[in-house]
Amino acid sequence: MKLCAVIIASLLVCVAVASSSDNQKEFAQEKEMTREETQSLGEHEKDDEVTGSEERSCIEEWKTCENDCECCGMSTLCAASWVDGHQIKLCRNEGGKLKKVLHFIQKSVSKIKSCRK
């Protein structure tokens, strides 16, 4: 019975942590400065000529990135992997926090059921 109580308590903690990390990510995105605010107009026009019509607001999945804020979508993260001794950062869809929380709930329920046997 104590194990079941511990599992339920850990489930509640995980849900609280998942919701607070989503709030932190939204806060970081609100505070991020736009390209126009950080560069002069001349530099911005020069970059447009070099890159053409490339979209800068967000990077699509499986393209290179520097941090999570650059990737499109809430569940997409900038994940690092090593290829031939070099670190490459790519935007990857990690399935989101909700999917991980639901999977944890499913595992917890199955453990609670096994506690009762």
Swiss-Prot record:
Propeptide feature: residues: 21-56
Region named Disordered: 20-55
The keyword Disulfide bond is assigned to this record: yes
GO terms assigned for molecular function: ion channel regulator activity; toxin activity
Subcellular location: Secreted
Disulfide bonds: C58-C72, C65-C78, C69-C115, C71-C91
Signal peptide span: 1-20
Primary residence: secreted
Positions with biased composition (Basic and acidic residues): 23-55
UniProt KW keywords: Disulfide bond, Ion channel impairing toxin, Knottin, Secreted, Signal, Toxin
Gene Ontology CC: extracellular region
Lineage top rank: taxon: Eukaryota
Tissue: Expressed by the venom gland.
Stated role: Putative ion channel inhibitor.
Family of the protein in this entry: Belongs to the neurotoxin 03 (Tx2) family. 02 subfamily. HNTX-XV sub-subfamily.
Record text about domains: The presence of a 'disulfide through disulfide knot' structurally defines this protein as a knottin.
Protein name, as recorded: Hainantoxin-XV-5
Organism: Cyriopagopus hainanus
